[in-house]
């Protein structure tokens, strides 16, 4: 569904303080307060001040109410952690019920949640402590790594949910996956040599840990290996995804994707702000030869069919939504992100030993943020994924205790 631009206000000031966005009455709210109290408005302030406010009104929107159920297919190495962080911050501030287990950060089989070799099943949630509460209240969001099954996710979220995912150029995605997960330890060679010795030589390649490897994006989206090797099955999957997903974002056009996500979810553009999470250090990125890139692209043909189709679809959605409007919102979103970085980030660090434990990422190969912890809202822009999920779990347990008291 395409939505026009919501009413927006811009303010100008010479005395920067904390980020704000504005609702009609009162006019001024710090962005931190607005997010904490779940203000649903797309009216936001271009400065960081609560003084000398000058307002400029733009066109209004037909957007009726914010979406409160979201199914996010978290693909591997596609900027999905940043999208997940955006969704989790919104869900946290809205007291949402998250689809999760009582421990861990994935949604694989309960016997081993981190091995994503079987499609998600709603039956896996029967033993979670908040099962009865969720049966009564419903779940609001599924946003963790899983092997997707549209029907089973719909069974959990119920009516009214919006479904989104994100894709990335398959060669770049595979290079990132290979080096982030350290496949070089598995195959005893770097990616350049792997392309030559394995792919070029047509040697059989098993999935690492039974779920990581070739055409990873289609695998994440629920396809089995036999079907991924079948051109007709791949095209049928793409067609089905086009029907199932309300928005397929593209990592290489990230800000435009978030502008459209703001439309799809009917959320303020201010809620699309983020820091770039899990970005690798330059030293951890392997530059491939053109020959190896070509071999990889041919080898990843199925993911390329998927990627190219939805890349065109994103352009189509941008045109329908209004290309000039999207571009304008992209500029605005970048300004908002700059403000978040200015207000919240004390330092971008390579050596995570200087960070408190909440902000240390899973991999030593990625950049991390030293966050100004004196500002409560800032924390959740830069907190590590696992620590954020644990905090959400604690909040969910608190809601469960209150729910039980009211029985």
Which functions belong to the PLM regions below?
Residues 1-407:
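Membrane-interface amphipathic segments in extracytoplasmic regions
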């Amino acid at each position: 569904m395409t939505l026009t631009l919501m009413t927006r206000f811009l303010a100008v000031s010479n005395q920067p303080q904390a980020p704000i966005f504005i609702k009609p009455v009162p006019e001024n709210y710090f962005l931190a307060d607005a997010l904490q109290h779940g203000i649903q408005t797309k009216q936001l302030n271009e400065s960081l001040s609560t003084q000398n406010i000058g307002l400029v009104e733009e066109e209004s929107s037909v957007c009726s109410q914010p979406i409160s159920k979201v199914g996010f297919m978290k693909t591997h190495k596609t900027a999905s952690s940043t999208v997940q962080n955006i969704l989790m911050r919104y869900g946290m501030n809205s007291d949402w019920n998250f689809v999760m287990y009582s421990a861990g950060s994935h949604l694989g089989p309960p016997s081993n949640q981190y091995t994503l070799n079987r499609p998600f099943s709603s039956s896996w949630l029967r033993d979670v402590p908040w099962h009865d509460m969720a049966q009564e209240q419903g779940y609001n969001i599924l946003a963790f790594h899983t092997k997707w099954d549209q029907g089973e996710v719909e069974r959990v979220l119920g009516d009214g949910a919006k479904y989104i995912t994100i894709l990335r150029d398959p060669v770049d995605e595979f290079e990132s996956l290979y080096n982030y997960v350290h496949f070089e330890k598995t195959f005893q060679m770097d990616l350049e040599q792997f392309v030559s010795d394995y792919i070029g030589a047509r040697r059989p390649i098993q999935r690492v840990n039974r779920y990581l490897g070739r055409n990873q994006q289609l695998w994440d989206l629920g396809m089995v290996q036999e079907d991924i090797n079948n051109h007709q099955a791949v095209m049928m999957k793409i067609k089905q995804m086009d029907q199932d997903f309300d928005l397929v974002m593209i990592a290489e056009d990230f800000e435009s994707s978030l502008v459209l996500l703001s439309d799809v979810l009917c959320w303020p553009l201010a809620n699309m702000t983020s820091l770039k999470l899990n970005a690798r250090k330059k030293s951890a990125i392997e530059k491939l030869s053109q020959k190896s890139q070509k071999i990889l692209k041919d080898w990843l043909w199925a993911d390329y069919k998927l990627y190219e189709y939805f890349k065109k679809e994103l352009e189509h959605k941008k045109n329908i939504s209004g290309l000039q409007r999207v571009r304008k919102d992209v500029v605005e979103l970048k300004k908002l992100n700059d403000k978040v970085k200015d207000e919240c980030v004390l330092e971008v660090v390579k050596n995570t030993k200087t960070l408190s434990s909440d902000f240390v990422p899973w991999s030593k190969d990625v950049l991390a943020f030293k966050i100004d912890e004196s500002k409560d809202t800032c924390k959740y822009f830069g907190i590590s994924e696992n620590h954020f999920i644990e905090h959400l779990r604690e909040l969910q347990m608190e809601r469960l205790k209150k729910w039980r008291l009211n029985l």
